[in-house]
Amino acid sequence: MIDIPLVIAKKTYNSRLLVGSGKYKDLNETKLATDMAEADIITVAIRRTNIGQNVNEPNLLDIISPNKYTILPNTAGCYNAKDAIRTCQLARELLGGHNLIKLEILGDKKTLYPNIVETLSAAKTLVDNGFDVMVYTSDDPIVAKELENIGCVAIMPLASLIGSGQGITNPTQIKLIKEHATVPVLIDAGIGCASDAAKAMELGCDGVLMNSAIANANNPILMASAMKNAIIAGRESFLSGRMMKKSYASASSPMVDLI
């Protein structure tokens, strides 16, 4: 299979690993891990991170430059469409007309599961207002297709609950979403280790977004490197086409003309 580049909202990206900017012990660790990951897209929680709203506080953009990275503002912490839309509008103002955003509307504080009703409502309004919407959603393929039909530029189903590190709990659903999508499908939430990231890519996903898996590791910088390599390995494995599973053994060497 021939690889095709990752294209989101008509822009081509080299890396299929997207990383978050939160949960690190300080901005220096954020920078070191981000550099090691070699990601092109860095997501930022507008309601929790200073990117210019507070002039007297450290600005994330001083170490994660928009000239080097594509900044992906997200609506983490929003529980309804109104707040999410307002947050996206603020991000557009702070980033000088930036239209690429990650829509994330949560259902409750215990599971952080997406509120699909509010997500669908907000997605339509944002698309109608010129935003390029990458959307966090459940692993329901019908919902995913509806979000695509609304005009979202990327579908981002969860692998498992945000920050849980449980990995991909329902791979069949993820494969169904990917099979029916005509926009990029990127895993968002639940990745815990490098093998989880590789598995997501082997399922055919176009990329993986993660934060906790790197930031909460004992060695975030080393884990960033592991995730970078896992994404590459998983993609190459998918493109290669794995061997068929068999019920019985099959010798690697021929069984004729033996000594």
UniProtKB/Swiss-Prot annotation:
**Which EC number(s) does UniProt give?**
2.8.1.10
At which positions is 1-deoxy-D-xylulose 5-phosphate bound?
A: 163, 189-190, 211-212
Reactions it catalyzes: [ThiS sulfur-carrier protein]-C-terminal-Gly-aminoethanethioate + 2-iminoacetate + 1-deoxy-D-xylulose 5-phosphate = [ThiS sulfur-carrier protein]-C-terminal Gly-Gly + 2-[(2R,5Z)-2-carboxy-4-methylthiazol-5(2H)-ylidene]ethyl phosphate + 2 H2O + H(+)
Highest taxon, organism lineage: Bacteria
Cellular compartments annotated: Cytoplasm
- InterPro entries to which the protein is assigned, alphabetical: Aldolase_TIM (IPR013785), Thiazole_synthase_ThiG (IPR033983), ThiG (IPR008867)
Query: Keywords, A to Z?
Result: Cytoplasm, Schiff base, Thiamine biosynthesis, Transferase
Quote the pathway field.
Cofactor biosynthesis; thiamine diphosphate biosynthesis
In this record, what's one Pfam family?
A: ThiG
Which catalytic residues are annotated?
102
BP-aspect Gene Ontology terms:
thiamine diphosphate biosynthetic process
A Gene Ontology molecular-function term?
Answer: thiazole synthase activity
Subunit text: Homotetramer. Forms heterodimers with either ThiH or ThiS.
The UniProt entry's sequence similarity note says: Belongs to the ThiG family.
Give a short account of what the protein does: Catalyzes the rearrangement of 1-deoxy-D-xylulose 5-phosphate (DXP) to produce the thiazole phosphate moiety of thiamine. Sulfur is provided by the thiocarboxylate moiety of the carrier protein ThiS. In vitro, sulfur can be provided by H(2)S.
- HAMAP family associated with the record: ThiG (MF_00443)
Protein name, as recorded: Thiazole synthase
The gene from which this protein is expressed is: thiG
